[in-house]
């Protein structure tokens, strides 16, 4: 599935996700950006079927995040994330469950490991 149209669609989706991450709190943005980069890199050599599923799921993520960003801009209230249904979790591989668990732990830490500040913010 390495045709030019597919490659263009992957790049466009990747860039849109990174743009949406700019609206996340800085520590979650750093975590999300790194995860997206790793996942897209990891799936460069996937089969056609895996690539199709990968694109559908990341498109769903982009759509959900875009909706949440637009709602947050209107309400000035930052609420990001979504619950996964049991049905979706049943389709995950063990490695994916482990990754999801690690992401959940990292993103819900009260004192997150990232000590990142917005540009122009004094230390």
Curated annotation (Swiss-Prot):
GO terms for cellular component: mitochondrial intermembrane space; mitochondrial matrix. Residues 1-31 form a transit peptide. The keyword Transit peptide applies. Keywords: Chaperone, Mitochondrion, Transit peptide. The keyword Lipid biosynthesis does not apply. Pfam families: Complex1_LYR_2. One of its GO terms (biological process) is mitochondrial respiratory chain complex II assembly. InterPro entries: SDHAF3/Sdh7. Its main location: mitochondrion. It is found in: Mitochondrion matrix. PANTHER family: DC11 ACN9 HOMOLOG, SUCCINATE DEHYDROGENASE ASSEMBLY FACTOR 3, MITOCHONDRIAL. Interacts with sdhb within an sdha-sdhb subcomplex. Plays an essential role in the assembly of succinate dehydrogenase (SDH), an enzyme complex (also referred to as respiratory complex II) that is a component of both the tricarboxylic acid (TCA) cycle and the mitochondrial electron transport chain, and which couples the oxidation of succinate to fumarate with the reduction of ubiquinone (coenzyme Q) to ubiquinol. Promotes maturation of the iron-sulfur protein subunit sdhb of the SDH catalytic dimer, protecting it from the deleterious effects of oxidants. May act together with SDHAF1. Belongs to the complex I LYR family. SDHAF3 subfamily. This is Succinate dehydrogenase assembly factor 3, mitochondrial. It comes from Danio rerio (Zebrafish). The lineage of its organism: Eukaryota, Metazoa, Chordata, Craniata, Vertebrata. The gene is sdhaf3.
